[in-house]
UniProtKB/Swiss-Prot annotation:
Gene3D superfamilies: 3.40.50.880. This is Imidazole glycerol phosphate synthase subunit HisH. The gene is hisH. The active site is at C79, H187, E189. One of its GO terms (biological process) is L-histidine biosynthetic process. Keywords: Amino-acid biosynthesis, Cytoplasm, Glutamine amidotransferase, Histidine biosynthesis, Hydrolase, Lyase.
Amino acid sequence: MLAILDYKAGNQTSVRRALDHLGIPCVITADPAVIAGAHGVIFPGVGAAGQAMNELLTTGLDKVLKDQVQAGKPLLGICVGCQIMLDYSQENDTKALGIVPGECRLFNAAWTEEDGTPIRVPHMGWNSIVQKRPCELLKGIEPEAEFYFVHSYYPAPPESYVIATCTYGEEFCAIHGGPGLWAVQFHPEKSGRPGLALLRNFYAYCKEASRA
């Protein structure tokens, strides 16, 4: 079973629907015991980093998440979840979780597309990613597959944590982390076949890890 972290940050229901479609058992929960008993945790989020962190701190779920990561529980952050896994976000000048080193930065409106057109912020719509190093999440997914993005800020971890990038005016990190600890800036639950494949891969990894 996968635990979808319930901290009033938006897209838990759409994540659950995607997992239901795949036949993957899951529950939306804020119960530490349920989270501890799950094969893995999905940490979704939409909205503002400051508000999301306030919810985590108010409910104590920040500590629950960190404890599970320390215990080796697989974790998948999505969108704002991906951003606040880092140390800091420029959005609302937010001290974040610090699970992964790095910061989250606002897109530079001076960046331009290849034809010289200024980018629009937020970055919204389908865009391809380029894999930089092997990752279990991307098994069987076509190179440069397209995923659905909606965001004004982007993660900027150290290069050694960058798994895949996307280009929107300039190249930015689209997936970061390491084995069992991943974060994706796009929305896999809204990304059609590639997104469903990524969620399926995460669950397969979680099940295998639980047997180890």
